[in-house]
Amino acid sequence: MNTSHSQAIFGAAQALMPGGVSSPVRAFKSVGGQPIVFDRVKGPYAWDVDGNKYIDYIGSWGPAICGHAHPEVIAALQEAIEKGTSFGAPCALENTLAEMVIDAVPSVEMVRFVNSGTEACMAVLRLIRAYTGRDKVIKFEGCYHGHADMFLVKAGSGVATLGLPDSPGVPRSTTANTLTAPYNDLEAVKALFAENPEAIAGVILEPIVGNAGFIQPEPGFLEGLRELTKEHGALLVFDEVMTGFRISYGGAQAHFGVTPDLTTMGKVIGGGLPVGAYGGRADIMGMVAPAGPMYQAGTLSGNPLAMTAGIKTLELLKQPGTYEKLTATTQKLVAGIKDAAQSAGMSITAASVSAMFGFFLCEGPVRNFEEAKATDSERFGKLHRAMLEHGVYLAPSAFEAGFTSLAHSEADIEATINAFRESFAAVA
């Protein structure tokens, strides 16, 4: 496969941007080789600058659930852009998307739009502290909530990909109030509450972990967190930046039947444009300025382009049969991946929920980040390179979830499974 143009562009980028990229995982540090530079995307496919075509299972890291450049989303954006790219003022489209989010997500009675998942998580942390008058927060090892200082503690893929424990430049004082527990370990959470009476503002987690690979909550875990937070006067926050509108129209909280106090969102709700949001109970959201004293603002928040793309994407997702199709597509893919690995004599643990999936090259089960680290990362790197040669683009990290879309056809899935068969055989 010829990637000479990708190599030349990435080579030039080294002198222009740190590591030659705008986000670390794109540099292929954990899988080896040089990154592929894309030229265009459409449906389930991506084409690089050398003309190579790939079946894409990253989907812009989650937003492209309807497929890249969906014609209805593009048409809506073309109409909207004629009116301007950003107003810096209230926009009627904000009301429309807000109503759709509130209607869909069980916990959300009011919502504030921002520009990224990181922004949403930064704001929600400030909000739970403002509302409770407490400073400490519990997060889970391997859960990633953006690159804000206070969350860069055992933060999963963002740092695992680079082999860093945390990040230089984060003062100890900043993370002194960030407590961590192993995912799926209620006893550890109980111990933290016991050790910090009336000091914990809230618990934040990915209801399905997508930044330490793909890890599902064990039965009773989310329910137990809901009970513990209520018992101790703390707030429960679901980071649904990844799972929101992806595993069901109402997100993970609708899928599992557990309603948090607050929810952060992003990715899908922007239809491929930069967006984030946080929302929840009206009495808590009433703390946010200008309604209340907790300050948070953003120049491009609620801009008409992101709102337009989000509205059209949610309209597409609300159509009957959407999530049944996504589930069937992903289940077929994961079954094929498992069979391909086992046929090659390799250990594998693989699972999916709706349009989100993942696999570890180790014996399961994988219930937390510590167990996830047992995956054979070196072999995954070889597998990743082999899959590229077969025209399949996977996340360039063993600690990232994968994503399917409505655009992936049965033929795409069959081609992908065949690529896995040949690639597993080559790296076994």
Curated annotation (Swiss-Prot):
InterPro entries (alphabetical): 4pyrrol_synth_GluAld_NH2Trfase (IPR004639), Aminotrans_3 (IPR005814), Aminotrans_3_PPA_site (IPR049704), PyrdxlP-dep_Trfase (IPR015424), PyrdxlP-dep_Trfase_major (IPR015421), PyrdxlP-dep_Trfase_small (IPR015422)
Gene symbol of the encoding locus: hemL
Cofactors demanded by this protein: pyridoxal 5'-phosphate
Main location: cytoplasm
Metabolic or biological pathway, per its Swiss-Prot or TrEMBL entry: Porphyrin-containing compound metabolism; protoporphyrin-IX biosynthesis; 5-aminolevulinate from L-glutamyl-tRNA(Glu): step 2/2; Porphyrin-containing compound metabolism; chlorophyll biosynthesis
Keywords: Chlorophyll biosynthesis, Cytoplasm, Isomerase, Porphyrin biosynthesis, Pyridoxal phosphate
Membership in a protein family: Belongs to the class-III pyridoxal-phosphate-dependent aminotransferase family. HemL subfamily.
EC number(s) from the headed UniProt entry: 5.4.3.8
Superkingdom: Bacteria
Protein name: Glutamate-1-semialdehyde 2,1-aminomutase
Segments forming a coiled coil: none
Gene Ontology MF annotations: glutamate-1-semialdehyde 2,1-aminomutase activity; pyridoxal phosphate binding; transaminase activity
Biological processes annotated in GO: chlorophyll biosynthetic process; protoporphyrinogen IX biosynthetic process
The organism of origin for this protein: Synechococcus sp. (strain CC9605)
Modified residues (N6-(pyridoxal phosphate)lysine): 267
Subunit structure: Homodimer.
Catalytic activity, reaction form: (S)-4-amino-5-oxopentanoate = 5-aminolevulinate
NCBIfam families the record matches: hemL, PRK00062.1
Transmembrane segments: none
Enzyme class per UniProt: isomerase
Subcellular location: Cytoplasm
Cellular-component GO terms for this entry: cytoplasm
